[in-house]
Amino acid sequence: MGYKHGTYQTETSSDISLPIVLDYGHFIVGTAPMNKVKRENRRVNEIVRLGTYKEAIQYFGDTYDLDFSISQAIKVFFELYKVAPLYVVNILDLEKHKTVKKTQNDLSLTNGKAVIPNHKLITDTLVVKENATSQVISDAVTMWTDEGLEIYAKPSNGTKIDIEYEEIDLSKVTKAQALGGYDISTMKRTGLELLDE
């Protein structure tokens, strides 16, 4: 019986799929859940080049709520098919495309946590109050999950809280805003007009 001498290799299939990088990119104009993006990363009517899924989440939020067209694109291009680059213009402005203030009362806390099944809530506007006294709970902590917004709070009295907030209203985003235009006074393009830049 003989021995094999030297080095040998075998090749097996892998679960890791490498991203496909195109010579050209796809151009998307749409809406993104900017309520889940850090303020310094929020972009409205600016072209952002995305090369990775990490960049997509950093600038345009997660893909839990597919009511947002940019979230749909990120899911398809980066999560499903891993195709890059993607050029994205968000037209959703949290200052313009939102509802009036809403309230929810008597939210029960379980182990100090309440879950709001809402991915459009604007956390910048969220106010958490004690149910019994209506006193603001300033040290409440929030975290986004696939279920919605988790609120962690410790009321001094009882196990219920009230909240006030505004939320994104996608019905206020118009076709005209998506098509965009050129503003002579600011010398800036918006929407699809940014394709010329």
Where in the sequence are the language-model features?
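Surface-exposed assembly/interface segments
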Residues: M1-E197
